[in-house]
Amino acid sequence: MKAFIVLVALALAAPALGRTMDRCSLAREMSNLGVPRDQLARWACIAEHESSYRTGVVGPENYNGSNDYGIFQINDYYWCAPPSGRFSYNECGLSCNALLTDDITHSVRCAQKVLSQQGWSAWSTWHYCSGWLPSIDDCF
């Protein structure tokens, strides 16, 4: 009986943990949100290396006490308000929890803002994406 209760609790908690996307589902959703097609492979590469395409990831604490959130691992010191209430510049004007949901709209909009202000090198994993990029041609 205890095992059954644990399984039910895990099943109910699973949706709150986000979802795992793949290169094509990410590319299609970002395209539907208006992201230019010539950027989609770069975003797929970043998502692969930052979160393994998982929307519900909160990264380990950084050297300054901040954390990174969501599929693009957006930093809470600069871009979103952390749940702890700790100071944040909150440039995207949203709660970091909004970056952890199945709906990637907030993550995409905030990531686009990061890109426009800091460029691709804002992501520490960008060096993995500066040469070879995953193909998205078969996604459409």
Swiss-Prot record:
Gene Ontology MF, one: lysozyme activity
Residues at the catalytic site: 50, 68
Keyword Hydrolase appears in the UniProt entry: yes
Domain C-type lysozyme per the UniProt entry, residue ranges: 19-140
Tissues in which the protein is found: Found in the midgut.
Signal peptide: 1-18
Disulfide bonds: 24-139, 45-129, 80-96, 92-110
GO CC list: extracellular space
Keywords carried by this UniProt record: Antimicrobial, Bacteriolytic enzyme, Disulfide bond, Glycosidase, Hydrolase, Signal
Family designation: Belongs to the glycosyl hydrolase 22 family.
Protein role: Unlikely to play an active role in the humoral immune defense. May have a function in the digestion of bacteria in the food.
Name recorded for this polypeptide: Lysozyme B
UniProt organism field: Drosophila melanogaster (Fruit fly)
